[in-house]
UniProtKB/Swiss-Prot annotation:
Example GO molecular function: protein homodimerization activity
Protein name, as recorded: Protein GrpE
Family recorded in the similarity comment: Belongs to the GrpE family.
Residues spanning the membrane: none
A GO biological process held by the record: protein folding
Listed GO CC annotations: cytoplasm
Pfam families found in the cross-reference section: GrpE
Subcellular location: Cytoplasm
Gene: grpE
Lineage: Bacteria, Pseudomonadati, Pseudomonadota, Alphaproteobacteria, Hyphomicrobiales
InterPro entries listed in its UniProt record: GrpE, GrpE_coiled_coil, GrpE_head
Taxonomic source organism: Parvibaculum lavamentivorans (strain DS-1 / DSM 13023 / NCIMB 13966)
Low complexity composition bias: residue spans: 29-43
Function description: Participates actively in the response to hyperosmotic and heat shock by preventing the aggregation of stress-denatured proteins, in association with DnaK and GrpE. It is the nucleotide exchange factor for DnaK and may function as a thermosensor. Unfolded proteins bind initially to DnaJ; upon interaction with the DnaJ-bound protein, DnaK hydrolyzes its bound ATP, resulting in the formation of a stable complex. GrpE releases ADP from DnaK; ATP binding to DnaK triggers the release of the substrate protein, thus completing the reaction cycle.
Length: 213
């Protein structure tokens, strides 16, 4: 009789186990679904964060580039300020050099040769002073530009003080040099003062000289 009841007990146990497995499966499905939903919801957030990080990185790079450009510009402005700070003073000193040269130029060679020793010493002192001025100018980046007769007038470097007719030269040719010009760095400190050839009436050589830079 015990043998007849044994299959029934096994059948009950089997059904119970199946019910337990089914309950576990049903219980795990909402959790898995929730995890999937959480992952799907987190996806857009990750993409947004990556986009924000990329934007911040680009802003940082642009800011660094702007800072470097500002530093270079400030350095250039500092160098220009140092180089050209004394431009007005140097321009005034050029007049002193001009006056020294005019004083020397008024003496003819024979007059200088016949002058007393004291006068010769004074002339030599004036010449030495002018040479010292030129040396000081060069030390501070100031260089002389002296056009030669026959050169073409350059409105960027020369100042035409007058025109000379009847020179048989093309209009705009430098025929007289009244004073040297000077550059400071790459800028014009003072234009060279010149006289230029004037076009003859009806002449085909050249035309009216352009005296405006």
């Amino acid at each position: 009789m015990s043998d007849e009841k044994k299959p029934e007990a096994e059948t009950s146990e089997s059904l119970q186990k199946r019910e337990e497995k089914l309950a576990e499966t049903l219980a795990s499905e909402p959790a898995a679904q929730g995890e999937a939903e959480d992952a799907a919801a987190a996806g857009p957030d990750v993409a947004a964060l990556e986009a924000e990080i990329s934007d911040l990185r680009n802003r940082l790079l642009r800011a660094a580039a702007d800072m470097e450009n500002n530093r270079k510009r400030a350095e250039r402005e500092k160098q220009d300020a140092q180089r050209y700070a004394a431009a007005n003073f140097a321009r005034d000193m050029l007049e002193v050099s001009d006056n020294l040269r005019r004083a020397i130029a008024t003496l003819k060679e024979d007059e200088r040769a016949e002058a007393a020793e004291s006068v010769k010493a004074m002339i030599e002192g004036v010449e030495m002073t002018d040479r010292q001025l030129v040396t000081i100018f060069e030390r501070h980046g100031i260089r002389e530009i002296t056009p030669q007769p026959g050169e073409r007038f350059d409105p960027n470097l020369h100042e035409a003080m007058f025109e000379v007719p009847g020179t048989d030269q093309p209009a705009g040719t430098v025929v007289h040099v009244l004073g040297a010009g000077y550059m400071i760095g790459d800028r014009l400190l003072r234009a060279a003062r010149v006289g230029v050839a004037k076009a003859d009436d009806g002449a085909a050589k050249g035309g009216k000289v352009d005296t405006i830079a």
